[in-house]
A protein has these predicted regions:
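N-terminal targeting leaders characterized by basic, low-complexity, disordered sequences
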Residues: 1-75
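N-terminal compositionally biased, intrinsically disordered segments and leader/signal-like regions
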Residues: 8, 40, 74, 84, ...
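Low-complexity intrinsically disordered segments
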Residues: 36, 60, 70, 80, ...
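N-terminal export and membrane-targeting signals
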Residues: 81-98
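Hydrophobic core
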Residues: 99-106, 142
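C-terminal region of N-terminal signal peptides and the immediate post-cleavage residues
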Residues: 103-131
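Extracytoplasmic/lumenal domain signature
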Residues: 120, 128, 133-139, 143-156, ...
Length: 582
């Protein structure tokens, strides 16, 4: 990705991706080698050898047949057989819903925040001196939204990857009817490119990549578009014109993840970079200003590397983030406004924990360090969910934080494969997890690559799963009664959320790493030929008709943001686009 043709061949990650793509689409198995090196897909990983799988003898799972019509169970000591379980699931969901309604009638307890004040950890962080003067604490309005657009945030907009805690909100319509490129960024010729080291090699990266979703939000009567890119910068541009609102904020390396905007109206941007730092940036000054940064090596032990791919989740003055250092972090932000009217923070790392355990590392054998957290954490009913590159999906109960109760792990499930897609949660609390298929492990073959889990059944959580040869890097999207999931090889699946049956598929030039976006019954999906497609998914039972396409430059790995008639997305050709009706 972004290197010369002469160095493209022999790239271990590139060859891993090509092999995965070839498994999914043998007829296009050489397609990667024909893509322009400045625009081709890929991320910053060395080659991964398939570990010898370790299976628990009592493990059972459910796999959807290739035609997607039946759910079957497989155990280690018996053949596959059909199983009815959905009536029990629906009954459980109804009981949970009743309890939620009862709790709402009594009154939902809000998180009350208190600073732990652990002075011993101050030396671990970078922080310029606070603004002097008596602070005014920031009010918190971030009641965690359910699946869908109901946010209740003080800041109107699409504020984090997939919009909110359940990672299931995609923006606001209308969807453009006959769109074209309205502007591209940067305005001058050229693109957003920078060098970044991978192992012992330095190469050029261009544009924006996985996940790379921009944030779009209203501030002081103006609509901002904020995104990180492979030029090492965070950009703050005007919705209408594409001109800089603030000068770009430069970090020390490329930015691969999606930025987050403070949901409570504080002028703060939260973002990580490949330069080791997770930052809090103020935007209420003539220039974007770093207020604080957490170093990836500020906690111990760590594994893998120092990047921050996940989009931070901010709720009730706590920031939740997993890092490629393989740790899960919780930071009390202590946001306030100083006497000079400028925003300030006094962050405190109140909790961190390894994202791995001994059972996982034993299962990974020679790949015991391959446990980075590269997805964006999700939240539902007091529990934070995330997965890691070792395939461990886990849930941590954080409901006791205001009372000083340390978070504890309450859910554990092993997919057997790299799991970088963010966990998506529906309004009944079910989890939808996309799993890659790079190593060909026996465990991944058992579990499948698109999995619906019930965390209330921790000993047997699989509701259904779907197998795909290349697996899923993109985060699935919920739409009505289906989950829409783009696979690495270019197949886009629509799967019945209750039964796991495949309703329809689309075949696009892969890899399709862009997470699907669905607003107003319209699916927005980019492909690796640089084409952004729109499909009518108002009838989820039929293959959707295509409504329009827009050609961009380079593979579309980043997830678009839709806000009030305009789409915003970057591509690997080096530019960022505003797309809408003229």
């Amino acid at each position: 990705m972004g290197r010369d043709e002469g160095t493209r061949r022999g790239d271990p990650y590139w060859e891993d991706a090509a092999r995965a793509y070839g498994r999914s689409h043998p007829e296009r198995s050489n397609a990667y080698r024909d893509v322009d090196p400045a625009t081709r897909p890929g991320r910053d990983r060395p080659a991964r050898a398939a570990p010898a799988p370790r299976q628990r003898p009592d493990q059972r799972d459910r796999i959807v047949d290739p035609i997607g019509q039946r759910v079957r169970t497989r155990s280690s000591d018996g053949p596959a057989h059909l199983t009815p379980r959905h009536d029990r699931r629906r009954l459980g969901a109804l009981l949970v819903g009743a309890l939620v309604l009862l709790a709402g009638a009594v009154g939902v307890q809000q998180l009350v925040l208190a600073d732990d004040g652990d002075a011993d950890e101050d030396a671990l962080f970078e922080a310029p001196p606070s603004t002097e003067g008596a602070p005014t604490s920031a009010p918190s309005t971030t009641a965690p939204p359910p699946a869908g657009p109901a946010s209740g945030f003080a800041t109107p907009g699409l504020l984090t990857f997939r919009g909110g805690p359940t990672r299931s909100y995609y923006g606001e319509g209308p969807v453009p009817a006959a769109p074209e490129v309205l502007w591209s960024y940067p305005g001058a010729s050229g693109g957003m490119c920078a060098e970044s080291a991978e192992g012992n090699e330095t190469r050029t990266w261009c544009g924006s990549g996985w996940t790379g979703q921009p944030a779009v939000f209203e501030r002081d009567g103006r609509t901002w578009v904020v995104f990180g890119a492979y030029d090492r910068k965070v950009h703050f541009v005007d919705y209408d014109t594409g001109e800089d609102i603030l000068p770009p904020f430069e970090t020390g390396d490329i930015i691969k993840g999606s930025v987050s905007i403070d949901p409570d109206g504080m002028p703060l941007v939260y973002t990580g970079s490949r330069d080791n730092k997770l930052r809090v940036i103020a935007i209420d000054r003539p220039e974007a200003t770093e207020l604080w940064a957490l170093d990836a090596d500020a906690v111990s032990p760590t594994k893998w590397n120092d990047d921050w791919d996940g989009s931070p989740l901010v709720m009730d003055d706590y920031l939740y983030e997993g890092g490629e250092n393989s740790q899960f972090h919780i930071v009390k932000l202590n946001r306030s406004t100083g006497a000079d009217g400028l925003v300030q923070v006094d962050p405190d790392l109140v909790f961190n924990a390894p994202g791995w355990d001994d059972e996982l590392t034993s299962s990974l054998n020679t790949r015991q360090n391959d446990v980075s957290i590269e997805n964006s954490v999700a939240y539902h009913e007091g529990v934070i969910y995330f997965a890691n590159s070792g395939g461990l999906v886990q849930g941590w109960d954080v409901s006791g934080l205001p009372d000083g109760v340390e978070p504890s792990r309450v859910f554990r499930f092993w997919t057997g494969e790299d799991t970088d897609a963010s966990v998506v949660i529906d309004d009944e609390g079910f989890l939808y997890v996309g799993v890659e298929n790079e190593r060909g492990t026996a465990r991944a073959a058992e579990v499948g690559q698109l999995v619906k889990l019930d965390p209330r059944q921790p000993d047997d959580p699989i509701v259904w799963s779907l197998a795909d040869p290349g697996g899923f890097w993109a985060t699935p999207a919920l739409h009505d009664d289906v989950v829409i999931a783009p696979a690495d090889g270019g197949t886009v699946y629509a799967v019945d959320r209750q039964t796991g049956a495949t309703r329809w598929t689309l075949d696009l030039p892969g890899p399709t790493w862009q997470s699907a976006v669905v607003v107003d019954d319209t699916l927005i999906q980019g492909d690796c030929d640089g084409v952004l497609h729109a499909y009518d998914v108002s009838d989820t039972t039929i293959e959707p008709p295509e409504l329009w396409t827009v050609q961009l430059e380079g593979c579309i790995e980043s997830t678009p943001a839709l806000w009030h008639g305009r789409l915003f997305v970057g591509a690997r050709g080096g530019r960022f686009y505003a797309i809408g009706d003229a």
